[in-house]
């Protein structure tokens, strides 16, 4: 039996329009909901219960991490985790049965279940880089899709003389980067180039973007539309808000507190 849980951080990390009407559980509410799912699956006859969750093991996500959830429920046999991009087949000194494959399809998670004992026999990660043989049919289909993407988004829109930093940390989530500067400068340019009349002087116009939304590097040379879409894949909208300077400082301090 499988059940899923999403990190409550989602409600502050995604476009509000996309989650309108949804409620994200946290703390005891999330634990209780998980226990209800486990009990329901057990009563329906499930021999093994696996949680497919996007909670992670970052300390900053406490008290809503996968390891805290596991420790506070009963009857959960295994967890497949995400969010923190951790590479692991178990967690902590007490070896909690939590698997996470990292990120960017670098690993494939494998779970072996013994049909006779109805128990999880083993779990492992397969390093994708070790898989060197191509399946001809899959490769042909992939090349077909890649060709369509290149035809639509492979055109050059700009050039750069330097590499533009797409790293997470240290990088766009922890400090100023040239790619973060370029993106926010572009946001300001777009607003000033539009027909929108701003009610503040130009020197009071600033741009803020979510560091977690910057997903890749752009390397020296041509910049294609595909490269831009790879860096900014979420299709967010540009919004204008008027805030007092004190609130802006508060927002910046909140984003740098850790």
Language model: regions and residue ranges:
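Loop/turn elements at helix/coil->beta-strand transitions in domains of secreted/extracellular proteins
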Residues: 1, 42-49, 74-77, 95-96, ...
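Amphipathic, non-transmembrane alpha-helical secondary structure
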Residues: 28-35, 39, 249
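Solvent-exposed loop/linker segments at secondary-structure transitions
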Residues: 42, 61-62, 78, 91, ...
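Active-site-adjacent helix-turn-beta-strand microarchitecture at beta-sheet edges
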Residues: 1-28, 59-157
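Short acidic, glycine-rich surface-loop motifs adjacent to enzyme active sites
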Residues: 2-12, 34-60
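Short, ordered loop/turn segments at secondary-structure junctions
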Residues: 54-55, 83-85, 211-213
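Glycine- and other small-residue-rich loops at beta-strand/loop junctions that grip anionic moieties
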Residues: 53, 101, 172, 176
């Amino acid at each position: 039996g499988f059940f899923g849980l999403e990190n409550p951080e989602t409600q502050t990390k995604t476009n509000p329009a996309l989650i309108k009407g949804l409620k994200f559980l946290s703390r005891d509410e999330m634990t209780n909901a998980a226990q209800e799912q486990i009990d329901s699956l057990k009563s329906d006859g499930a021999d093994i219960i696996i949680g497919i969750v996007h909670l992670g093991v970052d300390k900053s996500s406490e008290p809503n991490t996968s390891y805290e959830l596991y420790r506070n429920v009963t009857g959960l046999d295994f967890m497949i985790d995400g969010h923190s991009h951790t590479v692991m087949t178990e967690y902590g000194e007490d070896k909690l049965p939590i698997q996470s494959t990292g990120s960017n399809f670098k690993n494939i998670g494998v779970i072996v279940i013994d049909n006779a004992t109805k128990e999880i026999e083993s779990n492992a990660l397969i390093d994708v880089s070790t898989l060197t043989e191509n399946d001809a049919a899959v490769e042909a289909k992939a090349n077909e899709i890649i060709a369509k993407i290149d035809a639509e988004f492979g055109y050059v829109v700009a050039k750069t003389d330097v590499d533009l930093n797409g790293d997470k940390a240290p990088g766009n989530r922890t400090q100023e980067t040239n790619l973060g500067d370029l993106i926010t400068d572009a946001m300001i340019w777009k607003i000033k180039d539009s027909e929108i009349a701003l009610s503040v002087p130009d020197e009071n116009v600033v741009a803020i973007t979510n560091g977690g939304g910057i997903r890749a590097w752009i390397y020296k040379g041509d910049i294609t539309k595909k490269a831009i879409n790879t860096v900014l894949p979420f299709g967010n909208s540009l919004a204008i808000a008027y805030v007092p300077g004190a609130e802006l400082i508060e927002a910046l301090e909140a984003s740098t507190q850790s």
